[in-house]
């Protein structure tokens, strides 16, 4: 009632407060258009809070048509009057190019003004700019400093980032216990990346005691929020029976969720399950399909597995040239089995022209990683005997039966 009377007398403070009431439906019927109109009246009179609010209306299309250029103008007017939230929002406009030409230097300038007044969101974004070198030179120490200020005010994403800083010793002295502490704060606020990171701390015993049950607890929270890495890891723990009762059905369930979310490790794991009939009916065609998905995303293990599918005609038509293609991709990523397999193909002329030098080169790469069959193949080639052929037949057959679970 009194806000209305004062607003009718063009009092900008009253117009603003009445607008807040109409926007929220507090004491009056909710009316976003009326709220925006009242904000506009107060904004025209130079009232910074109303200018900022009107900017919000234009940003989100609340009570007015969405108009990012108008939003920018409103934020700019309020920011120049010292309105801290408008300064932060103006920084966002410059960072994203919303209503104005993208300008990271200007974004940093406005973030800094708001951050120095203690606005946590601005402190986090300023820290992020220093971390990424956006609008300023990279400065890990300043990045950590500003993120810590935001983290101490409860900004979960800043708490997670600060945990990463302490884990990696980036901008601060490495301290795994403090890393776990900040991950916990962020995880308890629901930050999915922090939940995964905290689960990993418990699994590895980094900064906290090793506790598989606690690891599973936090991985599950992240997995239930749709985090593909956590879903894959949870599948791994169910497959192994670590921190939970062993349950291959649930392992497959979580691997599948992760794989469907595009996680290459889970796709490879699911392929392994189908290849070995672990938790599912053995199906070499499905195994090859999942290996293909993972291989195309760059999974070296899947690339080698897919090469074997083509080499032996398991789930794919036999195609030695295709096998060599995938072996080569995996070998170049350092997979010893793939290096050995590629060497064998070069030695025997499978899918490529015979090339003893290439064969020896790849055998040596595998042998340097401790691959026993590669060592035998080298001995066989150097002695001119049949060692390589014998080793090759045995190793290639054995490779397809290896059960190798991958996890993050």
What positions do the PLM features span?
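Canonical tetratricopeptide repeat
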Residues: 15, 51, 65, 87, ...
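Short hydrophobic alpha-helical membrane-entry/anchor segments
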Residues: 386, 398-408
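TPR/TPR-like (Sel1-like) alpha-helical repeat modules
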Residues: 39-42, 183, 219, 353-372, ...
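Hydrophobic face of amphipathic alpha-helices that form TPR/SEL1-like repeat modules
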Residues: 17-24, 53-60, 89-96, 125-132, ...
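TPR/TPR-like alpha-solenoid repeats
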Residues: 6, 21, 42, 57, ...
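Short helix-capping/linker turns of helical repeat alpha-solenoids
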Residues: 8-11, 24-26, 31, 44-47, ...
